[in-house]
């Protein structure tokens, strides 16, 4: 019932917390959650507001707690309908299937039920847990655990850039002078070591690994529509759901250099109102179906992800058609999204990895879509008409659709008539960008005031993406260098020197760019020593290459991990894409 209560209060754009905080532009996010544990539970109300000192907004939010408590009281007063309750039940049942798509998640679920005393795990039993929740159950837990209850309140406020010195104490640790008393139940406690060959902490003898198994490649059907849209479908009956990924190539490659972020903002606007329905109404319809439909933007593409129960596939695609082909691009939605993006950038400026990544991209790829980053200045230059013009780059001739699901091929394709009718605009994707020439080794310093450690990111341009060429071979080579906890970088900088919690190297690439990188966060005082070690490891690896043991371990790792490479629906989507 507490899960249901959290969903009723804060799930979706029609929820009271979304309406009172996000829709009203008081906050960037407002969430209600119930992170239940084995021996205890918590119920969270989390609101990420805009700072009080945003003077140009003329609105101040000094008492977040009062706003939250007033919203809770308003929810109780207005109540919820039986339709609302059925809606969140369907949504939770749909989400529960996602937890059973891999061997790992199934094993975790089965063991969790067992050691929490629930007995043997049964899918039908779990679904019935949600189905059997009543209105009385929801209100009972609300009255018992939420209404008029005390709470631990944690407010984190940013320092105002307009105030040089703080005139009052704004942070207090309630446990600063707490004296811990020893619990008498632990007096005279003696550790008794287990004599078992397999005890709770380890095996004494490492089990023999079985021979690698050839992965089972999913069967699939390919079909191209007359308007240029390419599709791939694979039937899988693991869970009663359908997963679809529509990739519209281009993304930020179409952006004006002075309006970086236009691709992202357009994708966010696609998640809002349509010409027929408000974003709140669409959110409710999707929740009723237990479906998810979301647009997002990456460097060189816009992605539409769709998840739905097989039984609701047709109704979900009706909403997809409306969102894809008939967006509204309302001024009200646009204003809120721009404001949220500006504040999001302010937050990202506190993230060392974001700052380093943005700087590295600019150094490697210069004034191109791959080197530019969204800024407050570029966001403010974007107008609604720019979004509408950018939307015209969405065309089937540069798009690919991949789907896997518990549905027949015929049933899948018969619902795609709206995509067959999607107008081909004969869009061409920009290519042949000019990147800066590679220079000798250079060091760039970014000063982040108050940083507790140094984030190191080093790299250079490298191969573009491929499945079995130089890019793939580079990935294999990188495994022993820094591809995981067994890599030389990790073993040296963490295990041997104790400079960091982790150090890794990586390759990443797409159709037009690629890079090799090394990253780690180290204690500030050992920054120079860490760099010395990294260069030493690179020199040694370049001169001597992999050892026979490392090569054997790399092969085993790739071969053994391949057995489950196409297990889950999302893994199948990635492979077919």
For each predicted feature, which ranges?
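Charge-rich, well-structured scaffold segments of protease-associated domains
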Residues: 1, 24-203, 281-428, 496-497, ...
């Amino acid at each position: 019932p507490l899960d249901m209560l959290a969903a009723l209060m804060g799930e979706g754009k029609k929820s009271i917390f979304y309406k009172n905080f996000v829709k009203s532009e008081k906050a960037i996010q407002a969430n209600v959650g119930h992170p239940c544990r084995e021996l205890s539970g918590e119920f969270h109300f989390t609101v990420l507001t805009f700072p009080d000192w945003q003077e140009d907004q003329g609105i101040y939010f000094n008492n977040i707690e009062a706003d939250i408590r007033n919203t809770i009281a308003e929810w109780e007063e207005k109540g919820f309908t039986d339709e609302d309750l059925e809606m969140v039940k369907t949504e939770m049942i749909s989400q529960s299937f996602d937890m059973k798509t891999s061997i790992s998640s199934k094993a975790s679920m089965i063991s969790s039920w067992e050691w929490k005393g629930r007995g043997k795990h049964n899918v039908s039993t779990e679904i019935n847990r949600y189905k059997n929740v009543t209105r009385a159950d929801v209100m009972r837990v609300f009255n018992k655990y939420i209404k008029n209850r005390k709470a631990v309140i944690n407010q984190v406020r940013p320092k105002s850039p307009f105030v040089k010195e703080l005139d009052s104490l704004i942070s207090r640790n309630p446990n600063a002078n707490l004296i811990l008393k020893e619990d008498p139940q632990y007096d005279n406690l003696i550790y008794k070591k287990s004599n078992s060959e397999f005890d709770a902490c380890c095996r004494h003898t490492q089990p023999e690994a079985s021979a690698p198994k050839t992965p089972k490649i999913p069967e699939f059907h390919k079909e191209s529509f007359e308007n240029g849209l390419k599709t791939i479908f694979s039937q899988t009956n693991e869970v009663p759901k359908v997963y679809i990924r529509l990739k519209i190539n281009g993304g930020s490659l179409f952006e004006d250099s002075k309006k970086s972020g236009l691709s992202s903002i357009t994708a966010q606007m696609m998640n809002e109102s349509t010409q027929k329905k408000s974003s709140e109404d669409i959110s409710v319809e999707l929740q009723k179906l237990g479906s998810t439909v979301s647009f997002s933007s990456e460097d060189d593409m816009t992605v539409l992800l769709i998840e739905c129960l097989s039984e609701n596939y047709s109704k979900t695609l009706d909403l997809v058609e409306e969102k894809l082909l008939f967006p509204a691009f309302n001024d009200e939605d646009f204003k809120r999204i721009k404001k949220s993006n500006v504040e999001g950038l302010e937050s990202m400026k506190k993230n060392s990895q974001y700052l380093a990544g943005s700087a590295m991209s600019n150094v490697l790829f210069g004034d191109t879509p791959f080197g530019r980053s969204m800024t407050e200045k570029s966001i403010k230059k974007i107008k609604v008409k720019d979004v509408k013009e950018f939307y015209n780059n969405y065309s089937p001739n540069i798009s690919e659709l991949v789907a896997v699901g518990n549905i027949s091929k015929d049933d899948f394709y018969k619902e795609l008539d709206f995509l067959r009718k999607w107008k081909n605009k004969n869009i061409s994707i920009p290519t042949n960008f000019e990147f800066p020439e590679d220079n000798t080794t250079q060091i760039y310093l970014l000063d982040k005031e108050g940083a507790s450690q140094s984030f190191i990111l080093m790299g250079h341009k490298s191969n573009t993406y491929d499945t079995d060429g130089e890019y793939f071979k580079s990935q294999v080579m990188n495994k022993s260098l820094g591809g995981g906890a067994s890599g030389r970088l990790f073993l040296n900088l963490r295990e041997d020197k104790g400079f960091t919690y982790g150090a890794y190297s990586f390759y990443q690439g797409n159709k037009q760019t690629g890079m090799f990188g090394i990253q780690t966060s180290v204690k500030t005082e050992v920054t120079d020593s860490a760099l010395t070690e990294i260069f030493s490891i690179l020199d040694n690896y370049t001169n001597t290459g992999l050892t026979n043991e490392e090569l054997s371990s790399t092969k085993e790792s790739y071969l053994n991990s391949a057995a489950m490479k196409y297990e889950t629906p999302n893994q199948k989507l990635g492979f077919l894409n």
